[in-house]
Design a protein with these regions (language model features):
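Short, Lys/Arg-enriched anionic-surface-contact patches
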Residues: 1-17
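Short, amphipathic alpha-helical "recognition" segments used to contact nucleic acids or chromatin
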Residues: 13-29
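Short alpha-helical "recognition helix" segments of helix-turn-helix
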Residues: 31-37
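Short coil turns linking two alpha-helices in DNA-binding domains
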Residues: 40-42
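C-terminal flanking helix
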Residues: 53-54
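Short Lys/Arg-enriched helix C-cap and helix-to-coil transition segments
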Residues: 57-73
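Helix-turn-helix/homeodomain-like alpha-helical modules used for DNA recognition
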Residues: 72-125
Length: 125
């Protein structure tokens, strides 16, 4: 049995980080090392995010609200003026949006074929 929180921590949060890393490097002109330092991860982790070796289990790009959130998070991080708790809060809000709007359901079904995602409404609560 895979809990939604497990799925979020192992798939959604890395996917959000991957999108933020991509923005920091491509839009804000940061090096992998700079992005890693600001996000509190290693440079090899940033490389894996950029090469879709980490954070690729669930596709979140193209979802308007997620794109907006990752843009805001990248701006917050790159400004270096925002407290880490504010960044954490924004990431958590993005995770909540993803769960409540059922963007994790297909991945959950792939990982746990016995789950009936049509009758499941756990994440909407």
């Amino acid at each position: 049995m895979i809990l939604p929180e497990e799925l979020a921590s192992k798939s959604v949060i890395p996917a959000i980080r991957a999108l933020v890393v991509k923005r920091l490097v491509e839009e804000h002109g940061m090096t992998q090392q700079q992005a890693a330092k600001l996000l509190g991860v290693t440079q090899p982790a940033v490389s894996k995010y950029l090469h879709q070796k980490r954070g690729a289990a669930i596709r979140l790009n193209g979802i308007k609200e997620v794109d907006q959130a990752t843009g805001e998070i990248a701006n917050m991080v790159s400004s270096r003026k925002v407290k880490p708790l504010e960044v954490m809060s924004r990431i958590e809000a993005a995770c909540t949006y993803i769960k409540r709007n059922r963007y994790m359901c297909d991945l959950h079904k792939r990982l746990e074929p016995g789950i009936d995602i049509e009758s499941c409404h756990i994440c909407e609560q």
